[in-house]
UniProtKB/Swiss-Prot annotation:
Region of interest: Disordered: 1-25, 62-85
SUPFAM superfamilies, sorted: Ribosomal protein S20 (SSF46992)
Organism: Bacillus cereus (strain G9842)
GO cellular component: cytosol; small ribosomal subunit
Keywords linked to the UniProt accession: Ribonucleoprotein, Ribosomal protein, RNA-binding, rRNA-binding
Listed name of the protein: Small ribosomal subunit protein bS20
Gene: rpsT
């Protein structure tokens, strides 16, 4: 554990950011899984709506640096293929 006051503050901020980032990534993964589940159940109408939400969450995660931009694009592309198939 840090002894210097500024290092203690940085450690606290780091932990807060880690928790926040984990929350955003979890929401993103849940949105993707929702789309995949709807596609599996042939509920394409709701899958398209869920895809819009998942796409926004993937873009936001990429913008914040939680995942790489190419990874977000790849996931969106694969989801779009499933929804439009």
């Amino acid at each position: 554990m840090a002894n210097i006051k500024s290092a203690i503050k940085r450690a606290k901020l780091s932990e807060e950011r880690r928790a926040h980032n984990a929350s955003i990534k979890s929401d993103m993964r849940s949105a993707v899984k929702t789309v995949e589940a709807l596609v599996t159940n042939n509920d394409l109408e709701n899958a398209k709506e869920a895809f819009k939400t998942a796409s926004k969450k993937l873009d936001k995660a990429a913008r914040k640096g939680l995942i790489h931009q190419n990874a977000a694009s790849r996931q969106k592309s694969r989801l779009a293929k499933q929804v439009n198939a």
